[in-house]
Amino acid sequence: DYTIVVQTSTGPLQLNKITSFKSKQDVTDVRVKRLDGITDHVRFFDGWSGSFDIERQDAAVDRFFAGLEQGYYSGINEQPAQIYETIQEANGAVSQFRYDGVLMTLADAGNRAGDATVKQSINFVASRRILVS
């Protein structure tokens, strides 16, 4: 069982029906070729990125991103968000991770059709993912 909470600078962003959540660690791998012919590798951690899909229930997501865009054109710097990922493990334990320095983009505002729900996609980048518990 997963719970995702998005905390923005203006309060929590209510995402009522999250249908998928995906994240990955971003790294840069640098190859160092030594004079003796052996290749060493140096890894630099470059944060995290991911996406989540939701079923549109109300205008919360649309209003949030409209506010970000309005702020941008008004010269207001975007404040990063946080994502809290809580996992109920199979053995009953609870794991919680926090993504810091999160910037989100509305990758897909959804397709409107007469006989279907509206699926929206949000992409994100984060500075770090920290184990909380």
Regions found by a protein language model. Give the residues of each.
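Solvent-exposed edge beta-strands and adjacent loop segments
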Residues: 1-64, 94-121, 131
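Short, acidic/charged, Gly/Pro-enriched secondary-structure junctions
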Residues: 66-98
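Residues on the solvent-exposed faces and adjacent turns
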Residues: 126-128
